[in-house]
Amino acid sequence: MDTITNLITSIKNAYMVKKQTVRVNATRINENFGRILLQEGFIRNIREHKDGQKFFLIFTLKYRKRGEKIITLKRISRPGWRIYSDFPKIPKVLGGMGIVILFTSQGIMTDREARKKKIGGELLCFVW
């Protein structure tokens, strides 16, 4: 399983069992992905944790008042089926209420940032 799919699956599974935190391997991709989720308000906090020689990222999840999840993630591009988009054709999620996370030549960013910089890239996932 690739890094992004592993991260998305970990977050989805944690929400299903109502966990407060998710622990994932500390990679640059996971860190940038988490930073975007934090900036957009989909998660509460990110912190680094060292267990022996391995580094992990711990994401603190956000819930609504009644314990409902606040985030839905849908993987778009996969290792066997890459999906790319030019900046004018980047889709909008729920009419702009959600975000698209892209992998571009300038790193991982949201659809809004990519449109502002006028660059396209690989569509990693939809978040709403």
Swiss-Prot record:
An MF annotation (GO) of this entry: structural constituent of ribosome
Record-linked Pfam families: Ribosomal_S8
GO cellular component, one term: ribonucleoprotein complex
Gene3D superfamilies membership: 3.30.1370.30, 3.30.1490.10
Location relative to the cell: Plastid, Chloroplast
GO BP of this protein: translation
Keyword field contains Transmembrane: no
Statement: the UniProt record of this protein carries the keyword Chloroplast: yes
Function (record text): One of the primary rRNA binding proteins, it binds directly to 16S rRNA central domain where it helps coordinate assembly of the platform of the 30S subunit.
Quaternary structure (record): Part of the 30S ribosomal subunit.
Protein name per Swiss-Prot or TrEMBL: Small ribosomal subunit protein uS8c
Organism: Gnetum parvifolium (Small-leaved jointfir)
